[in-house]
């Protein structure tokens, strides 16, 4: 099978360097891609869901001393729902690293749900790798900003990039497959994205759609674009 993209960049975005590489590998593997000795993220997701709930509940308890149990429960449910976890996973850029089977690669809605699961599985992996303190730090870094400020739903990177280009009168982003490695049953794609007047960005993923999203995310990061109209990109 093709080698996974460099995990050090992902670890830097998560905020934890893994001592046990098998934990982060498992956290990124959907059950549809678990074959032979490869373990899926299901058990880690179960654990991460509980760790996430405890850390966020503790954050809310300290941040809102006048809130009653009902308000705290509503805030907790909003922060730890799958959509919120998927947003965190997108911010971490996990879509380029997730391993899924062929049956899942073309299902965008399932992949969105998978991203939420992977966020929780990564939290579980951090907990097993380093204990509660590192897991608390990772969760706090990712979820505390959501707790303290209302926000618009995070768009996927391809949509954000296309809207950014359109708002500036630029041609739409152009995606191109530049390499394909690995066996036929588990290929890894390298995709580049280009907008006229800008340097292309490139990323890898275990499905074309995921590699395109990762390339768009790389472009957005390099040009310091958050949402169209929210922050100016390069001139």
Curated annotation (Swiss-Prot):
SMART domains linked: DSRM, RIBOc
Catalytic activity annotation: Endonucleolytic cleavage to 5'-phosphomonoester
Top-level taxon of origin: Bacteria
Cofactor(s) the protein requires to work: Mg(2+)
Ranges of residues in domain DRBM: 156-225
GO biological process terms held by the UniProt record: mRNA processing; regulation of gene expression; rRNA processing; tRNA processing
Keywords: Cytoplasm, Endonuclease, Hydrolase, Magnesium, Metal-binding, mRNA processing, Nuclease, RNA-binding, rRNA processing, rRNA-binding, tRNA processing
Binding site for Mg(2+): 45, 117, 120
Stated role: Digests double-stranded RNA. Involved in the processing of primary rRNA transcript to yield the immediate precursors to the large and small rRNAs (23S and 16S). Processes some mRNAs, and tRNAs when they are encoded in the rRNA operon. Processes pre-crRNA and tracrRNA of type II CRISPR loci if present in the organism.
Family the entry assigns: Belongs to the ribonuclease III family.
Record's protein name: Ribonuclease 3
């Amino acid at each position: 099978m093709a080698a996974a993209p460099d995990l050090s960049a992902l670890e830097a975005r998560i905020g934890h360097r893994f001592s046990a590489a098998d934990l982060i590998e498992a956290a990124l593997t959907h059950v549809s891609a678990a074959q032979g000795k490869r373990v899926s993220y299901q058990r880690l997701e179960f654990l991460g869901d509980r760790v996430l709930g405890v850390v966020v509940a503790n954050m809310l308890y300290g941040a809102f001393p006048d809130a009653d149990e009902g308000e705290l429960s509503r805030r907790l449910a909003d922060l730890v729902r799958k959509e919120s976890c998927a947003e965190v996973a997108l911010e971490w850029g996990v879509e380029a690293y997730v391993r899924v089977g062929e049956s899942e690669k073309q299902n965008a809605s399932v992949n969105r749900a998978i991203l939420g699961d992977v966020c929780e599985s990564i939290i579980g992996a951090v907990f097993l790798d380093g204990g509660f303190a590192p897991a608390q730090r990772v969760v706090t870094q990712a979820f505390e900003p959501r707790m303290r400020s209302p926000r618009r739903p995070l768009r996927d990177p391809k949509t954000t990039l296309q809207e950014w280009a359109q708002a500036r009168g630029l041609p739409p982003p152009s995606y191109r497959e530049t390499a394909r490695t690995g066996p036929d049953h588990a290929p890894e794609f390298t995709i580049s994205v280009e907008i006229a007047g800008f340097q292309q960005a490139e990323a890898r993923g275990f499905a074309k759609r995921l590699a395109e999203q990762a390339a768009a995310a790389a472009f957005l990061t390099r040009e310091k674009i958050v949402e169209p109209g929210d922050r100016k990109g390069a001139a």
